[in-house]
């Protein structure tokens, strides 16, 4: 018991502190001083610390909100880009199909045009052949008539008199003129 009373007695012999200050010697500080310092820190530091945490929380929330807005805008832009891509792909397919159908149509038109040109050339060829045949036939007829006429004239000259000869010539000339009109 003497030790306990000595402790209280020795408390009375402490000198009073001349000023308030911090004791930086951790081993010389007692739990009462530590609890006072910790209490003061908690009391005054709580507001500062909570303000720091609130500011940090607001910055984090704002950053998250901004990130979500940016993400939403990026998603909207992505959807718009995808829609434009689908539209462009559809237009490209349409142009491709129109191009193929136009090529087929041009090919058919070219084939039809060539076919018509060949038909016209065939018709011109047939007309030319027919015309040449008619010309040759007319020339042959004319020569046959000329030879027949010369033969008839030769026979008439040897067999007929002048008067009969003149009548026959006039009749043949009339007949020859009628034949010429028919052939022309």
From Swiss-Prot:
Compartments where located: Plastid, Chloroplast thylakoid membrane
The protein's name in its UniProt record: ATP synthase subunit b, chloroplastic
Note: In plastids the F-type ATPase is also known as CF(1)CF(0).
Record's bilayer topology term: Single-pass membrane protein
Protein's UniProt keywords contain Isomerase: no
CDD domains in alphabetical order: ATP-synt_Fo_b
Main location as per UniProt: plastid
One Pfam family from the record: ATP-synt_B
TM segment ranges: 27-49
Function: F(1)F(0) ATP synthase produces ATP from ADP in the presence of a proton or sodium gradient. F-type ATPases consist of two structural domains, F(1) containing the extramembraneous catalytic core and F(0) containing the membrane proton channel, linked together by a central stalk and a peripheral stalk. During catalysis, ATP synthesis in the catalytic domain of F(1) is coupled via a rotary mechanism of the central stalk subunits to proton translocation. Component of the F(0) channel, it forms part of the peripheral stalk, linking F(1) to F(0).
Family label: Belongs to the ATPase B chain family.
InterPro entries tied to this protein: ATP_synth_b/b'su_bac/chlpt (IPR002146)
Keyword Plastid set for record: yes
Subunit structure: F-type ATPases have 2 components, F(1) - the catalytic core - and F(0) - the membrane proton channel. F(1) has five subunits: alpha(3), beta(3), gamma(1), delta(1), epsilon(1). F(0) has four main subunits: a(1), b(1), b'(1) and c(10-14). The alpha and beta chains form an alternating ring which encloses part of the gamma chain. F(1) is attached to F(0) by a central stalk formed by the gamma and epsilon chains, while a peripheral stalk is formed by the delta, b and b' chains.
GO cellular component: chloroplast thylakoid membrane; proton-transporting ATP synthase complex
Coiled-coil regions, chain positions: none
Lineage start: Eukaryota, Viridiplantae, Streptophyta, Embryophyta, Tracheophyta
């Amino acid at each position: 018991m003497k030790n306990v009373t000595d402790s209280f007695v020795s408390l009375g012999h402490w000198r009073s502190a001349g000023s308030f200050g911090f004791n930086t010697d951790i081993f010389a500080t007692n739990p009462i001083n530590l609890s006072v310092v910790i209490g003061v820190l908690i009391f005054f530091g709580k507001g500062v610390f909570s303000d720091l945490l609130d500011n940090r929380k607001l910055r984090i929330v704002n950053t998250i909100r901004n990130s979500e807005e940016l993400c939403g805008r990026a998603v909207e832009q992505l959807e718009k880009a995808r829609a434009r891509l689908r539209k462009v792909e559809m237009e490209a397919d349409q142009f491709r199909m129109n191009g193929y159908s136009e090529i087929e149509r041009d090919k058919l038109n070219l084939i039809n045009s060539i076919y018509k040109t060949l038909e016209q050339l065939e018709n011109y060829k047939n007309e030319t052949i027919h015309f040449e045949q008619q010309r040759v036939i007319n020339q042959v007829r004319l020569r046959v008539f000329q030879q027949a006429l010369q033969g008839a004239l030769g026979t008439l000259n040897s067999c007929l008199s002048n008067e009969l000869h003149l009548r026959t010539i006039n009749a043949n000339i009339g007949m020859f003129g009628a034949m010429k009109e028919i052939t022309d």
